[in-house]
Amino acid sequence: MADHIKDKSYYANARTEMLQFIPKDAQKILEVGCGEGKFSALLAEQGKETWAIEPNPKSAEIAAKSLNKVFQGTIDERLSDLPDDAFDVIVMNDVIEHLTEPWDDIQKLKSKLKKDGVFVSSIPNVRYAKNIFHVLFKRDWKYADDRILDITHYRFFTKKSIRRLWEENGYSVQRMKGINRTKSFAYFPFAVLLNILLLLSQLDVFYMQFATVAKKK
């Protein structure tokens, strides 16, 4: 299948909501799939040393202007360029779902973290209210250019399977929080009704993504 061409804005999201998950004392940070480097540039402004890997050549070129080091290529292509036991934090903001074998990749990257280093990630939640609504009532699963049903996503996750991804691959989850809660007039009431009927057991459906901080075991 031919590569799906993304709009330029796809690579330029600063993801400011993820800054809260970066430890304050972290000094050296690697972002995998940095796009144009907007998120890591915010960390650089705080005095952090910022490294990145980005497969898109144009985005990597832009990111290199504001970050300390940027390697253009995939994880497998550039893993050997990264020093072992070097990073306080590795970040993947909505990247894991684009990987064909994410469990292998997070295991490979573990050696690049310092002893007390953490892996910070944002991963889309396939149980988001909009998705459930479309499957149940529109009886459809329609891929799109972005968001949860992005046509370039290889893997789909729930809150439970996100935790399992980390716990079964050499990490312990330190923190997990839903982010980007639905504000839609159509889907917020649906999520509320679902939780009323099921005694608040479906709170995960409110969130588009889950942010996770995982420490290597």
Go through the PLM ranges and name each one.
Residues 100-104, 131:
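Short N-terminal helix/helix-N-cap motif within the alpha/beta-hydrolase-1
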Residues 145-161:
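Acceptor-substrate binding/catalytic loop of class I
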Residues 104-118:
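A short glycine-rich, Lys/Arg-flanked "PGG" loop and its adjoining helix->strand segment in the class I
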